[in-house]
């Protein structure tokens, strides 16, 4: 079944049934990973353009692999390799690629709303791979997929997000998605990094990490953006690590079944200690693997194809 929309820009306007459809499709896609030949002809003849104007390893590589496993033709373009470096506008670049036959444009940009701007001006489908501090829907979806895969459900779980909530597109997208699927979401971090209106999104705000950890099923640790410290939004790296770093002592406060997540890249020794990142409760590597499945699912659904045995053979 195809998505109900031309573009996929965020989770703020996506209903629970559509989120579940994406997660179910990702489950079907992940089965392909177990095959000797990890490729299906589903999107043969389709062209996917990955337009990345911000540095990325995981997301960009994940979209590349996802498109290729579906047999799509894929081209990846960075800011430095595009005519934007020569002064061309984002829209002119995207329109040029569209008239060359792009079916889906995957875009990452530092400006909030960049993906929506392209979606309103292109006939090709636009998939948001992160726009400023606004949204990162595919990261939230792979996080939700990982939680559901490991815990068997999302509804009723207590999920804690730690760190810079104010500037995190990952946090915002996770909150939108998790609350729609019935999870109870908590956030914790320095007061300067917690938006004043965050409770309006249906979350519970904590100031003390040790208190916030009580009774949680999932801990999602955000990368601390070190440039924020230079702007005085928190006193020092050492103080942040002391009050908000996930270490072995805090790990012991969790139940054995609780999950530890991180969207990457990690600042080991700051927001997360290696013993936590590499421990038995960590599902960080699974998040990366599941990212490919989620992005395959979205590319597949945006192309408007129906799931059947022939497509996945």
From Swiss-Prot:
Its EC number is 2.1.3.2. One of its GO terms (biological process) is 'de novo' UMP biosynthetic process. Keywords: Pyrimidine biosynthesis, Transferase. Carbamoyl phosphate binds at residues 58-59, 108, 136, 139, 264-265. L-aspartate binds at residues 86, 169, 223. PROSITE patterns: CARBAMOYLTRANSFERASE. One of its GO terms (cellular component) is cytosol. It catalyses: carbamoyl phosphate + L-aspartate = N-carbamoyl-L-aspartate + phosphate + H(+). GO terms for molecular function: amino acid binding; aspartate carbamoyltransferase activity. Pathway: Pyrimidine metabolism; UMP biosynthesis via de novo pathway; (S)-dihydroorotate from bicarbonate: step 2/3. Belongs to the aspartate/ornithine carbamoyltransferase superfamily. ATCase family. Catalyzes the condensation of carbamoyl phosphate and aspartate to form carbamoyl aspartate and inorganic phosphate, the committed step in the de novo pyrimidine nucleotide biosynthesis pathway. HAMAP family: Asp_carb_tr (MF_00001). Heterododecamer (2C3:3R2) of six catalytic PyrB chains organized as two trimers (C3), and six regulatory PyrI chains organized as three dimers (R2). This is Aspartate carbamoyltransferase catalytic subunit. It comes from Halothermothrix orenii (strain H 168 / OCM 544 / DSM 9562). The lineage of its organism: Bacteria, Bacillati, Bacillota, Clostridia, Halanaerobiales.
């Amino acid at each position: 079944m195809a998505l109900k929309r031309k573009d996929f820009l965020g989770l703020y306007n996506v209903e629970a049934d559509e989120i579940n459809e994406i997660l179910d499709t990702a489950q079907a896609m992940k089965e392909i990973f177990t095959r000797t030949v990890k490729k299906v002809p589903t999107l043969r003849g389709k062209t996917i353009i990955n337009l990345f104007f911000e540095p990325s390893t995981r997301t960009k590589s994940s979209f590349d692999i996802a498109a290729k496993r579906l047999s799509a033709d894929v081209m990846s373009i960075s800011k430095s390799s595009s005519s934007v470096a020569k002064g061309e506008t984002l829209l002119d670049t995207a329109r040029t690629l569209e008239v060359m036959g792009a079916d889906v444009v995957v875009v990452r940009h530092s400006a909030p709303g960049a993906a929506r701007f392209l979606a309103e001006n292109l006939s090709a489908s636009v998939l948001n791979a992160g726009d400023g501090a606004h949204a990162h829907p595919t990261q939230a979806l792979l996080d939700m997929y990982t939680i559901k895969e490991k815990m068997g459900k999302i509804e009723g779980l207590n999920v804690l997000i730690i760190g810079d909530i104010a500037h995190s597109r990952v946090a915002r997208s996770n909150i939108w998605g998790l609350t729609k699927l019935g999870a109870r979401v908590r956030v914790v971090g320095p007061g300067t990094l917690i938006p004043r209106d965050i409770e309006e999104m249906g979350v519970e705000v904590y100031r003390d990490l040790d208190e916030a950890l009580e009774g949680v099923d999932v801990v999602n640790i955000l990368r601390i953006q070190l440039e924020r410290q230079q702007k005085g939004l928190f006193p020092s790296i050492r103080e942040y690590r002391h009050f908000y770093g996930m270490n072995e002592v805090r790990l012991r406060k969790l139940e054995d079944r609780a999950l530890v997540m991180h969207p990457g890249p990690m600042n080991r020794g700051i927001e997360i200690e290696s013993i936590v990142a590499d421990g038995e409760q960590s599902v960080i590597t699974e998040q990366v693997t599941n990212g490919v499945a989620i992005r395959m699912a979205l590319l597949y659904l945006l192309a408007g194809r129906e799931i059947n045995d022939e497509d996945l053979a």
